[in-house]
From Swiss-Prot:
Catalytic activity: Release of signal peptides from bacterial membrane prolipoproteins. Hydrolyzes -Xaa-Yaa-Zaa-|-(S,diacylglyceryl)Cys-, in which Xaa is hydrophobic (preferably Leu), and Yaa (Ala or Ser) and Zaa (Gly or Ala) have small, neutral side chains
Tagged with keyword Chaperone: no
Gene Ontology, cellular component aspect: plasma membrane
Species for this entry: Streptomyces griseus subsp. griseus (strain JCM 4626 / CBS 651.72 / NBRC 13350 / KCC S-0626 / ISP 5235)
Subcellular location: Cell membrane
Listed name of the protein: Lipoprotein signal peptidase
Length: 196
């Protein structure tokens, strides 16, 4: 068991003499701790990229598309159309802007708590997507009109016969789908794999 944990990156707490019951040394724990830090760096890198892509796209949409006719991307099947959405992802729950702001803040806190024990690269990517998307929409809710914690999110990706959304929504959905897949495969954020 200790060998499997060493391979997948779960450090054990070493005993006073520098080895744990499975024979791993304090050096093994230090190497594994380094692997964990790299996963946090991966999470933060994915989050920053997702956040900056979302922020940049929204700035461009507000500057170039707001109060303009939609732009056809793939005929009328996919358009770019600027709207302000006070609700959640895909226009759901417009009357609960403050509640969605609180939920997004809670999601960010939970991600940072999970990140402390993160030893799985796929989980780092999934959580990074969630974090970047949550921060992107939270930024809109805090800084855009009509007011702090009540701001409307800028949405612009408009598939035919579907809700309008943005890159933050896409990152959140992709991160959520990846988490479901990882959970079904039995991979935990700490890198352990279990068979049920």
């Amino acid at each position: 068991m200790a060998e499997a944990e060493r391979i997948i990156g779960m450090p054990e707490n070493p005993d006073v003499d520098g080895t744990d019951e499975g024979g791993s040394t304090a050096a093994d724990a230090a190497v594994n701790a380094g692997r964990g830090k790299r996963k946090i760096l991966a999470l933060l890198s994915v989050a920053v990229v997702a956040y900056l892509l979302d922020l940049g796209s929204k700035m461009l949409v507000v500057a170039k598309l707001e109060h303009q006719p939609p732009i056809d991307i793939i005929g009328d099947w996919l358009q770019f159309r600027a709207i302000r959405n006070p609700g959640a992802a895909f226009g759901i729950g417009e009357a609960f802007t403050v509640i969605f702001t609180i939920i997004a803040t809670g999601v960010i806190v939970v991600i940072f708590r999970i990140a402390r024990k993160l030893y799985s690269l796929p989980w780092a990517i999934a959580l990074g997507l969630l974090l970047g998307g949550a921060l992107g929409n939270l930024t809109d809710r805090i800084f855009r009109a009509p007011g702090v914690f009540e701001g409307a999110v800028v949405d612009f990706i408009a598939p035919k016969n579907s809700a309008v959304f943005n890159l933050a929504d896409s990152a959140i959905v992709c991160g959520g789908i990846l988490i479901v897949i990882l959970s079904f495969k039995g991979l935990d954020p700490d890198g352990t794999v279990h068979k049920d």
